[in-house]
Amino acid sequence: VNAGDMLHLVGKTGDWYETRYRGTAAYVSAKEAYTAVAYLDKASDEVERVIAEGLELLGVPYVYGAVRLHDGTGNFLKNFTTSAFDCSSLMQYIFYQGAGILLDVTTRTQVRQGVPVTWENIARGDLLFYTNAQRYDKTGVERIGHVALYLGVNYILHTASDYAVIEQMSATRKAYFVTARKFF
């Protein structure tokens, strides 16, 4: 765990918060000098189950093109593993495990699912789709290059470049926002 990492707290004992990191119990200091706590409003049971699945995977490595849970038509892949994800495979896995929703395979196909929602109306559990520097000048779905799960209060759960994390959206991330989709 690095300074500035966002973690989901599951309990507190004395001066220590309990969290889950890479599927294992971990502890961080509860002293104010070391820890800032943000409280996020709860959503529907389905949304909370999807988020809980994502929280269990914090710290799992990012691998571009990681094996998907299924092929997009519901055929589950025998070589799937939870040892690595890219952004779209992470969303595909947590939406299926948490709510039984079969998301498609890539960000550019997932963005066609769900109900469009504007930035002003995004809510906990919505998928946020972004462009990136390489795709910024493209149009339509070809502009999409990243997906994240919105947690509320400007926080997202996603995986990009290193491992699955919770992070506060930066100005750059907001500038690359293209659209959002609601599933609940």
Regions found by a protein language model. Name each.
Residues 176-184:
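Low-complexity, Gly/Ser/Thr/Pro-rich intrinsically disordered linker/tail segments
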Residues 51-65:
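Extracytoplasmic/periplasm-facing segments of secreted or lipoprotein envelope proteins
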Residues 102-107, 143-170:
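Catalytic Cys-His active-site segments of thiol-dependent hydrolases/isopeptidases
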Residues 14-20, 135-147:
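Short, Lys/Arg- and Gly-enriched loop/turn segments at beta-strand edges
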Residues 1-13:
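Conserved beta-strand/loop element in small beta-rich adapter and peptidoglycan-binding domains
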Residues 6, 20-48:
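Boundary regions of SH3-family modules and the immediately adjacent low-complexity/disordered segments
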Residues 62-124, 129-130, 135, 176-177:
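Catalytic cysteine-centered active-site loop
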